[in-house]
């Protein structure tokens, strides 16, 4: 197949544009107002490397809609975009005029959702991507053993089918886990119907376009998450949070039926922040912490998140989590991992109502009096065992 040289690739100009974008990205670590302790700087530059890895996967390596493969869009090794610790995110590129078959086994996750999206996260604009169509495990048919097929595009089918659109760009699969130790991911594969085999070698213009998109990912995509994080940490009152349930529409790329509570925590070493709400009836709820760069905090070796299965409710049915730097000796501890400020993210999926969430900052000396007398205690040995189980569950989810 003919492949005339792309002049920007042949001359190295496209590559130099990428190198220049990496140089510009340092301002997201060294710029004004960014946390500047040695550990923050270390975490910031690690974030840039992680964000580059994520961008390479989404913009370069898994960018061929003619030969799609599922990739982990988010991973503990490359968290970004206020990712949810309960969720395994899978991504596959699409083209709107093709037909695709997704098949495999559902797994045992608490909730599974397939979402066809237009636009791309690299564009750095919330209005630049949205939903073409979606379906969850509540709407799909599965065999008794959990196996299934889902068709994308082409002629309409009565069941297990999602339409595409001319601007469709990718399929996003979300698997929500409640019981991390017992629930297992699905075994999923995707193919373009009628696709060529073997896969042709990439053309020079294709690689140039993918590098250009990676540049956009670094410039515009990275800037978006920084603006949103900075707006929460600096633009809202300390320890405040707002819960919203956006209307499901084609202009929204978030999970259908999910309400989001997003705010900030500010907590010094000798302080704690109590997160309090009355959980609604819903399919799934979770609370998690993130750093300045909107990376979920290390949820594999620390208890930086809790969900409806992991958390305990008090006798009055209220969830009370305790954000603190040191273990306060209560089961619902949310570990700051050394961060004095960051983002709090709360999600309620398919909730019958949206609850009010309160954040209250107290000193560690005041904490016991601020919690119900019946609040259970947890010993250091019990905490260590809990963290070991958590670590093993995360390793199992992301194995391979």
Residue ranges and their predicted role:
Residues 1-400:
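A compositional/structural signature for long, glycine/proline-rich flexible linkers
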